[in-house]
Amino acid sequence: MGLAEVVTEKNLEDCYSVDMNDAVRHGMCVSILSSELASELGMDDAFIHKVAVAGMLHDVGKLQISPYIYGRRRNTMKIEEMQYVRLHAKLGADILSREGYDQDIVDMVHYHHENYDGSGYPYRMRGDEIPIGARIIRVCDVFSALVSDRPYRRAFDADTAFGMVIDEVRHFDMKVFLAFQRMINTSDVIERTDYVLHGSIPGLDEK
């Protein structure tokens, strides 16, 4: 299974049934990775805070989408479902805008599925048209999805996941990607995110 199939299935499965435990863990993981990556890129503290918040909340729009496709059989209506799924970035941005979040955070959430080569969504933006915060979250979101357990597959180990990211490097800003590579090779961020994704977190795991 290639990266495109993994991430597509991840988005569909997430929207069929939003598990708040998993959603919070994924948001925490993306937040940690994004803030560390912003630091690696030399961003200032204010920007690092914004990208950490946006990373935590980047998938909030999925909470509005899941009721529309909940209960449908997974082998039917895939095209329609993907159209719903692709609304989540804009819906998330709309939610945060209504709640008064900083516009930079709103934009990071809105554009976090845009690809550097213009193949992303919702607007097929390319290159530096995409805000740098969204470019940061993009690579962190993909990596986090790959190292997370899903109902249809086990998590990939970090080395395998990074290899899959390399295979799709055209989707990412090369400056951001190279900083991401340095970060995961020289810091403890993988251990920290592994705990967030798979460890026991007081309060989160309590039923």
Predicted segments, located by residue:
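Histidine- and acidic-residue-rich, metal-dependent catalytic cores
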Residues: M1-K207
